[in-house]
Amino acid sequence: MESIVDTEDTIAAIASAISLGKGGIAVIRVTGEEAINSCKNIVETKSKYAWESHRVFHGYVKDNLENKYIDEILISVMHSPNSFTGEDVVELHCHGGVIVVNKVMDTLLSNNNKVRIANPGEFSQRAFLNGKIDLTQAESINQLINAKNLKSAEIAFNGVKGEIKKKIDVIKNDLIEQLSEIEARVDFEEDFSDFNYHDFSRSIKNIKEKIEILIENTKRGASIHNGISIALIGKTNVGKSSLLNLLSKKEKAIVTNIPGTTRDMIEVNLTIKDIPIKLVDTAGIRDTDEYIENIGIEKTFEMIQKSDYIIYLYSLEDGFNKDDEEIISKIPREKLITILGNKKDLIDSKKNDQKTFSSDIVLMSIKNNEGEKDLVDKIVKKCGSKEFENIDIFLNERQISNLRDCLKNLNDTDPIIANQLPFDLLSIEVRDGIKNLSRITGQELTEDLLNNIFSKFCIGK
């Protein structure tokens, strides 16, 4: 597509993660018209493959201003247009210590006045502007980088492969077919029989159903991307923090016998039997005059409303009492909920509260790791992976907004059809619907919107 932002500069960025300060290898990526020449200025090599496209060769980085060698590296080169960005691209593979990679980066910039540091997402932005990827692929790359679990990464990669665009194009082509029919009739009305509003309505209804399915699947897909939110709820000292540590296999929460230890929510992302979970430990609910603890309890009740699934813990030693009943009464009926009786080890095995409930109770001794399998089986049954079997793409808020705008355009054809108004009025709504679908893949964009989208990417991508 025609460039609507400046792509003339040669840009560079550290493309690998070095946040821990060390690593075996770090990669500096350079793209643009001066990418190869700028790297030639700081690289000494004797390789016979030097600077050939799609070759990797050995060399040394030299700071010519200080006349010092900086690092021993490997260099990979991709000539335009056969690169990620569609421009000349050079990648410098240097040693991964943060000091070394920053010095190599500084050397590249200081020895070349035609190279600048890339903005966030600028490499992907250039790939999009140069027609190497569509906008949904670019956004899927960002989702893949930020995936919190394996299933989310798999779905994001489907977007990278172009699966989102394929689904949008199917809907768009259906609308283009309807628009072509209308506009042909407008231009050559005498060559056609009367317009069949019923057939048109049926076609539009089928298209709307496809859009609604995409939107509905994305709601479920959001649970994969973010993790099904499971809130651990209960009074103080019933084992919520211990359960979080047990399921996450890490000491994420402080566990004491002092009531009210957890003042704020602790979140852990994990996967249980291929199901992505966001487990949230909340402040124990009790009457207290402690100001900060009360804030935590307020957040607990907010989490009850926001979560997908609630595990309510109580102490088998104390029994299920009116306080527990009162708390559970505040949980919306539509919420998935499992009752967990903890401290099984402290009671007579013949006397338990299992008969108190018709179903959905799990008895555990979290301290002794008894009953974990029963709880996991319950979670899998409630949130089973079958819920996600048909989810193969994930749409972000921008894409969903464009889909809803398209759906509104199609809904606005209903009164035109119902009143059999001049059929050329339908073309306005159908054409606007096509434009909204085109915005999803990037054919209809403003510079400000484009910059906003890519500003959310990491630097170097």
Curated annotation (Swiss-Prot):
The record's annotation in CDD domains points to: trmE, TrmE_N
Q: Where does GTP bind?
A: 237-242, 256-262, 281-284
One Gene Ontology cellular component annotation held by this UniProt entry = cytosol
A Gene Ontology molecular-function term?
Answer: GTP binding
PROSITE patterns hit by this protein = G_TRME
| Note describing how the cofactor binds | Binds 1 potassium ion per subunit.
Q: Which InterPro entries match?
A: G_TrmE, GTP-bd, GTP-bd_TrmE_N, GTPase_MnmE, MnmE_dom2, MnmE_helical, P-loop_NTPase, Small_GTP-bd
Q: Which GO terms describe its biological process?
A: tRNA methylation; tRNA wobble uridine modification
What are the binding positions for Mg(2+) in this chain? 241, 262
Q: What is its main location?
A: cytoplasm
Q: Name the cofactor(s).
A: K(+)
What residues does the TrmE-type G domain cover?
Answer: 227-384
Coiled-coil regions listed in the entry: none
User: Which keywords fit this entry according to its UniProt record?
Assistant: Cytoplasm, GTP-binding, Hydrolase, Magnesium, Metal-binding, Nucleotide-binding, Potassium, tRNA processing
| Positions annotated to bind K(+) | 237, 256, 258, 261
- Write the Enzyme Commission number(s) for this entry: 3.6.-.-
Where it sits in the cell: the answer is: Cytoplasm
Quick one: which residues bind (6S)-5-formyl-5,6,7,8-tetrahydrofolate?
A: 29, 91, 132, 461
Function in brief: Exhibits a very high intrinsic GTPase hydrolysis rate. Involved in the addition of a carboxymethylaminomethyl (cmnm) group at the wobble position (U34) of certain tRNAs, forming tRNA-cmnm(5)s(2)U34.
> What family is this?
Belongs to the TRAFAC class TrmE-Era-EngA-EngB-Septin-like GTPase superfamily. TrmE GTPase family.
Provide the assembly information. Homodimer. Heterotetramer of two MnmE and two MnmG subunits.
Q: What is this protein called?
A: tRNA modification GTPase MnmE
Which source organism does the UniProt entry give? Answer: Prochlorococcus marinus (strain MIT 9515)
